[in-house]
């Protein structure tokens, strides 16, 4: 699925090979909520370091230890299992003593901070993540250095990667079967997964089409552009001066976007409209599920992007906003295999 999508850097697949996540410590993720814990309130907040652990599994164990229902447990986002990850959990415990979490024991889990907070940490309440990644076996070369410089200066395609589609693209397959009336999906979580897979596939195909046409740094008629640093967007229609918008794009004041389809999707550039219309089979589902259309930046530029060649391979450090995938960046640099 992802292997069929075009590359932005050098317009060709990377020549360098590497191992990703050969060890958990090769993939370190630290969550950034964008706000501090209040220090008081009815929620116990726990900052946890996990090694080779599933987010939901750890959350369930924390809730059980505290004697509260799993429904009273919250977190901002799921993290990779085969990794070392740090993230916040919360447990709703109004009028209850904070448990002695020094007695909590679970292989691969270390509780770094215990405090209180006045609001539940909800899924999606995440600003971004810091990454520290070792690409084992990646050897220094001129080609790889060019790719590193390109990603640092121009960014990478903001593709959704394999996690979004399920094992062997199962979620996308099921979304299509659902849309074609072959199956009924009663489970709410499965409906959400399948809808997300369909929207992600169409987004990826629009990005791929723009790369293929050399239109990743060009404002086209009817493009929908986003103000940098915000979630506000507007349409580059006949009321807008395309030349002026092009200058703003080059100054990074605005960003090009691609669609996350929904029941109220707007017509956009010809490139985008063609892809969306080819997947109209999903339109009834979007209306049925009252899915709101949204926009997502076409390209993403990592903040604080740095690299160093070590004995074991290439180490990358960078920050990405919530919703962008580190593996989408990595695939622009190396042909990686996951252990």
Curated annotation (Swiss-Prot):
Q: Please report the organism this UniProt entry assigns to the protein.
A: Haemophilus influenzae (strain PittEE)
Q: What are the residue boundaries of the TRUD domain, all occurrences included?
A: 155-311
Reaction it catalyzes: uridine(13) in tRNA = pseudouridine(13) in tRNA
Q: Which UniProt keywords apply?
A: Isomerase, tRNA processing
What protein name applies here? tRNA pseudouridine synthase D
**Xref: InterPro entries:** PsdUridine_synth_cat_dom_sf, PsdUridine_synth_TruD, PsdUridine_synth_TruD_CS, PsdUridine_synth_TruD_insert, TruD_catalytic, TruD_insert_sf, TruD_pseudoU_synthase
One cellular-component annotation, GO = cytosol
> Which residues participate directly in catalysis?
80
Protein's job? Responsible for synthesis of pseudouridine from uracil-13 in transfer RNAs.
Q: Which Gene3D superfamilies match?
A: TruD, catalytic domain (3.30.2350.20), TruD, insertion domain (3.30.2340.10)
Q: Per the similarity annotation, which family is this? A: Belongs to the pseudouridine synthase TruD family.
Tell me the domain of life.
Answer: Bacteria
